[in-house]
Amino acid sequence: MEIKTNRLYIRNLYETDWPQMKNIFIDFNKSRYAIYDRPLPTEDDEVKALTKQFVDSSLFFVIFTLDKNEMIGYVCFHKDKDKYDIGYCLHSRYHSNGYAYGSTKVLIAYLIKNYGANIFTAGTAIDNIPSCKLLEKLGFTCVSIETVSFNDKFSFQGGNFKLDLT
């Protein structure tokens, strides 16, 4: 799958993309929002393994700028019955430029057209304001809030978002 917009090139992830994925992972782990997610691997073997796992999911897409042909992030989906749960991560150099919105909007339309998807879900920390705003701009609404923890030392309020196009 390949999609070009006026600013972006979006395609399926390949196993050979692991070095660029490693750069995205390292950048994410430095982010102030990393505490709201599981840490991403940074060792080559672990990055290769996770990249392969993502490739095998078949709903994992990478985003490149057209002008620099540089991978700037990814958008992925996990199918759960009739719902598609969305995840995304962009390198911090590309935040606040509309790339997350543009790529996610195009990929939601792609899943609607090619997979018959009409219900999308997402989870994010309520304190991750940029992520919450992105989801709301895409038409998602927060349907519930719950306490989330990925370890015994830290918990936070997570919002469960939904976009229902039925």
Predicted regions and their residues:
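Acyl-donor (CoA/ACP) binding surface of acyl/acetyltransferases
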Residues: M1-S31, F64-T166
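Conserved GNAT-fold acetyl-CoA-binding loop/helix
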Residues: N29-T51
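A short helix-loop-beta-strand connector motif used in the catalytic cores of GNAT acetyltransferases and
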Residues: L50-V62
